[in-house]
């Protein structure tokens, strides 16, 4: 073999190796197999499970603090008692997900899909549920101090017994949601919230902000409901029970 032929082989080998390297880099940036490999990694603090399929799993008690869970699918998954402090769950799917007694302090749940999920007795202090889809979701006895539900869809959500100090429900759909026994010890913002048949029987709303008479007129309270100064109970109170309350 001549020196010229050997030189051509070296050049071709180097070119192929370079192409392979570039292909690996392209795959990693495009979210291909290199990124997908992290989906098989066990739960741990700071894990990157973005857009992974985590449906129908038993992950109760997991430590997912500060985890990257953007777009992750947790449909029907059990995350009860798990810690997700500071986790990024933006656009995650939490449909019928069990999150009872989970720690979600400071977590980002912006634009999550969480129909019929259960956050009962969880701690979601200072969490963000902005623009979230959470119809019929349970927040019974949940800590929601400083939690932001701005523009969220919370029709028929259950906030019975929840702690809501300084929470935000601005522009939120709360139609037929239930707040019986909820504790609103701080200024809760209901500016432009939709309160059609929202159950506020016995709730102390005296420190709430952003409420107007039109909102109160379509809500459901009773003689024990405390309203902010200047607002009065409509003659339609109390409302009959909702036949579709399940």
Model-derived segments and their meaning:
Residues 30-246:
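Tandem repeat scaffolds
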Residues 7, 11, 24-25, 39, ...:
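Exposed boundary/loop context
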Residues 4-5, 27, 137:
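Absolute N-terminal positional cue centered near the fourth residue
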Residues 3-20:
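Bacterial N-terminal signal peptides that target proteins for export
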Residues 20-29:
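Hydrophobic core
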